[in-house]
Amino acid sequence: MDALLVEKVLLGLFVAAVLALVVAKLTGKRLRLPPGPAGAPIVGNWLQVGDDLNHRNLMALARRFGDILLLRMGVRNLVVVSSPDLAKEVLHTQGVEFGSRTRNVVFDIFTGKGQDMVFTVYGDHWRKMRRIMTVPFFTNKVVAQNRAGWEEEARLVVEDVRRDPAAATSGVVIRRRLQLMMYNDMFRIMFDRRFDSVDDPLFNKLKAFNAERSRLSQSFEYNYGDFIPVLRPFLRRYLARCHQLKSQRMKLFEDHFVQERKRVMEQTGEIRCAMDHILEAERKGEINHDNVLYIVENINVAAIETTLWSIEWGIAELVNHPSIQSKVREEMASVLGGAAVTEPDLERLPYLQAVVKETLRLRMAIPLLVPHMNLADGKLAGYDIPAESKILVNAWFLANDPKRWVRPDEFRPERFLEEEKAVEAHGNDFRFVPFGVGRRSCPGIILALPIIGITLGRLVQSFDLLPPPGMDKVDTTEKPGQFSNQILKHATVVCKPIDA
């Protein structure tokens, strides 16, 4: 960066500081703000807490400042909520008031400034997009129509692992094959198509683009330019890469998937998949073509990878807890005999369901949920919440607080058959809201729960899942991001066939 730009940035910071002090004096409005660490002018708490606002760091701050706290991150107000009662207030009781989504410089690029559903503000556009996406993606009818496909994809995973000679000896990184399964599960619903193998060039191009999109948006690297707009020139290359990637992904979605469905619909006149429903909504003038592409963007980001993370965490915990793995296997043998688990079987397998819930509790894929925002000044727990504050619900801490759970740091599925028997993943208890609650909850829960259950069930039926030779456990170190909680190292797992 040249000296002139640095000089301009420093001058901008000085002017901003003076203006902030003048405005504060002139307005004179005293707000009762939530507690939090004292901040410095302009940067606020940014230099104190840093960029890494992950669920564990925010838990530590909550233990210090309480169930609601305020961080001033440059020009952004960030409110962190860490109690079930306040989570209910944000997600349900004041679901309209706090029902919008925050914007940042990177997500504005990838969502066209909120032309999608997941990251748009609460209002008419969100209601329209939610309605258009619900019927083809998120209903019991969709589950009934697609469950056989999910079961088939899980069967093919088992077959491919069996064929790999390394799987039963040194082990394999099973995530790679499961990633193909997840893409096929969702692309069957979305486009009525699938990829034949992990070597498919189009699959690998799509996967690479989505991985880069995830890296760029999940990184904490760009926070400084979002918190302090005058520093945004330092992000020029970062944002240029985001724009370039967005164009590449949208072109790939359009050329290889959306246009194909248009051609098929013109030839047959039939509606066979979710994209056909969405293109019909475009034909009727309910949405524009950019909205169509942003729906594809949302499914690629919000449905595929998040479910894959949960499956990967579930496998790691089963490997590290062989007695729990055996109980799952014994339950399926008792209930199903030798039959492979199917989606309708899941309700007859309470221990398997408990394993899924315990995975979502301890290893929540979206530990802070998707951030909320209030468009107007609001109130929460008696405190003033300035308009356009970013509201983070630390859902992971709610589900792992030792004041509210028995031995929460243990992977113990039995809790959901004993003291927490009434607790479900759909949010009937605000201590456990892995998919959120209310208007902005994740509608993908209706797909994620059966896919996770089928996949873990089929793997445990078919294999004894073990750590690699010479190891007692697989590494479960976390890799937190802006919105995610992934496993740091994709585990190598020995898959020893049960019938061997």
UniProtKB/Swiss-Prot annotation:
EC number(s)? 1.14.14.91
Membership in a protein family: Belongs to the cytochrome P450 family.
Q: What does this protein need as cofactor?
A: heme
Residues noted as binding heme in the record, renumbered to the chain: C442
The organism sits in which domain of life?
A: Eukaryota
Stored Gene3D superfamilies? Cytochrome P450 (1.10.630.10)
InterPro entries named among the record's database cross-references:
Cyt_P450 (IPR001128), Cyt_P450_CS (IPR017972), Cyt_P450_E_grp-I (IPR002401), Cyt_P450_sf (IPR036396)
Protein name per its UniProtKB record: Trans-cinnamate 4-monooxygenase
Q: What class of enzyme is it?
A: oxidoreductase
One GO cellular-component annotation of the UniProt record comes to: membrane
Give induction info.
Induced by wounding.
